[in-house]
């Protein structure tokens, strides 16, 4: 795990050794960060959030309780191809949101800024 400076990580959180966290990231209780996930400065992951890589998250995003980002898509066309999620800056993901990876080889689910 590439951790810059001192992010605040709750002791019950599980963070992949492949994860890269910016210095001021805050990670709450029972959060899971799985696989190659890059989390930018100012991001907050609240209780029980689950992020699955490949996933890149920009600056100042807030992920509320029970959000899942990066899971395999619920689509018959998906055949376990390498896909992922890219998230911009200043987004808020409220409770229980799910965001799946792209469906076809090399496709990314992309979420821009200020959502």
Language-model segments: what does each one mean?
Residues 1-9:
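Generic start-of-chain signal for non-secretory N-termini
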Residues 105-106:
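Internal nucleotide-binding/catalytic subdomain
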Residues 81:
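Glycine-rich NAD(P)-binding loop of Rossmann-like domains
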Residues 7, 13, 19, 24-27, ...:
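A structural motif detector for beta-strand N-caps
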